[in-house]
Curated annotation (Swiss-Prot):
Site (Stabilizes free radical intermediate): 190
InterPro entries found in the cross-reference section: D1/D2 (IPR055266), Photo_II_D1/D2_sf (IPR036854), Photo_RC_L/M (IPR000484), Photo_RC_L/M_CS (IPR055265), PSII_D1 (IPR005867)
Name of the molecule in the record: Photosystem II protein D1
Propeptide span(s): 345-353
Function field: Photosystem II (PSII) is a light-driven water:plastoquinone oxidoreductase that uses light energy to abstract electrons from H(2)O, generating O(2) and a proton gradient subsequently used for ATP formation. It consists of a core antenna complex that captures photons, and an electron transfer chain that converts photonic excitation into a charge separation. The D1/D2 (PsbA/PsbD) reaction center heterodimer binds P680, the primary electron donor of PSII as well as several subsequent electron acceptors.
PROSITE patterns, A to Z: REACTION_CENTER
Reactions it catalyzes: 2 a plastoquinone + 4 hnu + 2 H2O = 2 a plastoquinol + O2
Marked site: Cleavage: 344-345
Organism: Cryptomeria japonica
Subcellular location: Plastid, Chloroplast thylakoid membrane
PANTHER family xref list: PHOTOSYSTEM II D2 PROTEIN, PHOTOSYSTEM II PROTEIN D1
Enzyme Commission identifier(s): 1.10.3.9
Membrane disposition: Multi-pass membrane protein
Listed transmembrane segments: 29-46, 118-133, 142-156, 197-218, 274-288
Amino acid sequence: MTAILERRESASLWNRFCDWITSTENRLYIGWFGVLMIPTLLTATSVFIIAFIAAPPVDIDGIREPVSGSLLYGNNIISGAIIPTSAAIGLHFYPIWEAASVDEWLYNGGPYELIVLHFLLGVACYMGREWELSFRLGMRPWIAVAYSAPVAAATAVFLIYPIGQGSFSDGMPLGISGTFNFMIVFQAEHNILMHPFHMLGVAGVFGGSLFSAMHGSLVTSSLIRETTENESANAGYKFGQEEETYNIVAAHGYFGRLIFQYASFNNSRSLHFFLAAWPVVGIWFTALGISTMAFNLNGFNFNQSVVDSQGRVINTWADIINRANLGMEVMHERNAHNFPLDLAAVEANSIDG
């Protein structure tokens, strides 16, 4: 009888825990995805802060030339970064217990791999948690779908690209200048500016910001005033009110006359779907572009594509970009390569005699 009572008590405790985890009444929803999200993001954040402040230099290229990234080793907020795991480690899973000592683990850039893998798990779980909360509340799932765009982008630069290139040392450093270095080297090696998927991403980001500004300004300019001119129009809105807060007909009429009639949405649902889909699809394409360039399916190459009747090259902007790419490529990892890959790949002409 005692055993039966204990089993009921433990089951009751588990049920209460499940109810608490999945309760939508909590100030912050936890959810089953949150059970994994919270420890992974806390770990990634904690290690990032500690490493950004105090991590010793890392041998990123695997040639015994450590690169300093932390504040205590001479960097500031702009130049500091978590240096990627050493090329000597490659794609190997490199937890602390795989190193002979903590000093070796730090020298080989172990914190980068720890942070990145925990971070990617955490943001994926955050996306799952968005879906989970939407499901509990009876909402549609599109919030999580929208968030999948930045998740895909982060996964592309922190995981897919290193896998394609064969080493975590090719991943994006976790810092401001490190991000810029990653972008410059990526352009030099993959000509990303000439990749159509990157172009779609640019259209998505800039177009999304334009449409967001247009929508916000149109709504703010067509509010239905419920107050006198002596007080703010915002005071006329009550949270949860049933009435429309702005006049979509007026906004539609204004914009339709400013551009042309069919450039303006007259359906609020279609409008907001478009506002969400435009940047999300653009960033999806950019993440897909990074993931294909990871395996060296690079941007368009129009180098020396225009020649005169004598066979002499007439430079186009593509050739100017190519010259810049070569310059950037010879300057990065200066002591790891004798020549940029584009030059080293060309077979030398044999000399007889």
